[in-house]
From Swiss-Prot:
Disulfide bonds join 65-67, 76-109, 86-99. Coiled coil: none annotated. Keywords: Disulfide bond, Mitochondrion, Oxidoreductase, Peroxisome, Protein transport, Redox-active center, Translocation, Transport. GO terms for biological process: protein import into mitochondrial intermembrane space; protein targeting to peroxisome. Residues 73-117 form the CHCH domain. GO terms for molecular function: protein-disulfide reductase activity. It is found in: Mitochondrion intermembrane space; Peroxisome matrix. This is Mitochondrial intermembrane space import and assembly protein 40 homolog.
Amino acid sequence: MGQGLSQPAQAVEEPSPPAVEAAPSSSPSPAPAPSSLEALAAEAMSFDEDGNESIDVKVQKALDCPCVAELKNGPCGSQFVDAFSCFLKSTEEEKGSDCVKPFIALQDCIKINPEAFSKEILEEEENDEEAEKSNLKVRAPAWSRESKPKL
């Protein structure tokens, strides 16, 4: 979840991955971490899916998916629920771009509670921040680059 504070959820709308069928399980073992928010959303939205339900009912069922239980019940649960719900309900062309505030709140909570998250999530955030910094270029102002007349 390594978005910059001035950036929306970096969720680029791509074709949705195929729906993943939730295999019935007798033990509530934690699911492996999905590679992206889109994958997590697709998995959660396919949980107990019924095409004739309102978006609010679909979001609630997605939040009931075991694939998000650890995030929902952790120390940043309310921030996760707000951000994830907003992302699922988003109708913007760039999915989730209208959810900046909830994702910033989630990001802030993750920074305050790093012990509650896997190293994989925290490293992903650090890598995103490093990549963002490496894309920055410092250029001298135009006035300083202009040639000065010789006297």
